[in-house]
Amino acid sequence: MHARITRFLLGGLLAFALLWAATGPGTAIAQEGEYGVYLKLVENAPGGFDQVVTTLREGAEAAGWTVVADYEVGVPDKNCSYRAHGIAVVSDEYVDQVLSHGPRAAFALPLRLGVFEDEAGVHVAAFNPLSLNRTIISETEFAEGSASAVAALQEIVAPFEEFQVESQYGQMRDEGLIKKTMGLIAGGAFDGKIEEAASVDVDEYGGLLATAEQLYSGLEDAAGDYDWKMRPMYLLDLSDQGVVMIGMTSGAMEAKAFDIVKEGTDEAREDFACPGLAYAAAFPLELVLVEEDGEVRVLLIDAMFRMKMFFEDAGKMKFAANMKMPPSLEGEMRDKIEDSLY
């Protein structure tokens, strides 16, 4: 995706309702408070799954956002006849807000929404910027940007009108810092969880964007290789601000993650066939390419830490039982990145 867009809408009640609840009357907007990792935006939408996806896509475009990823999400094979669909969006103004905190803040992009089915109907959710941006960008300094992102999500789902809801789920957090599980597993400041997967001289392929295009092409060619079959989903060209992003995903990875998390801490969903589809907005994973010190660096988030960011409510025992999954995902991505660039 090489297009840039010009319109950004700031409005809607949810962002300010959440911030008001966190800060109280007479208080300036702050990012303090307890927030869930996910926002449920639409509940029991009418018209069937495909129509909901179409309406969501059209809602994003009408609200002035560009769709950069639009794909069917992998679901568990066992006893799951339901579907999930991912849509990722960006706007020029929100990109500018995020990248004003530096190129590595790009891990907060793009905004991701998921359409998912369960026994109760078809729903729409998104990852919650009020929660995740505290982890990725700043504990306190991006409150207004996060509020504007939530307001934009409400604008995007405005076509669903009376089916809109304002609820949070996933791990409830009162701070951005994600601590170690059992004192050992994947915790700490976000900056320390950004890893370099590869670096090449900036002139090797002709600059930042050309390097990203070379990488994307190589990842496409290798999409069917290795166990997880990780594949690229989008290329987001922000090279005028020193960043290019590539989204990576895998149907097998998505299905496995949803099967592990299941209902999380929501006991009301524990009897559903595949409750983990509610977490569809967790993917794709992000590769961030930046130009630093004459090199193009390919950055990713430590895979175990990223799983904790989006699936921590699966619980300690499930993380302990599936310790091999994140390293195997990251290992495959690293191998494919190296094969594409070296």
Where are these regions (language model features)?
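Bacterial N-terminal signal peptides that target proteins for export
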Residues: 2-13
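C-terminal partner/receptor-binding element of secreted or periplasmic proteins
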Residues: 130-172, 313-342
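Bacterial N-terminal signal peptides
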Residues: 11-22
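Sec/Tat signal peptide C-region and signal peptidase I cleavage site
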Residues: 24-30
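Ser/Thr-rich, low-complexity intrinsically disordered terminal regions
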Residues: 49-53, 57-104, 108-109, 129-132, ...
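Acidic/His-rich structured neighborhood in mature extracellular/periplasmic domains
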Residues: 103-140, 145
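Intrinsically disordered, low-complexity acidic regions enriched in Pro/Ser/Thr
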Residues: 32-34, 46, 294, 333-341
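Terminal, regulation- and interaction-focused segments at domain boundaries
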Residues: 30-79, 138, 158-245
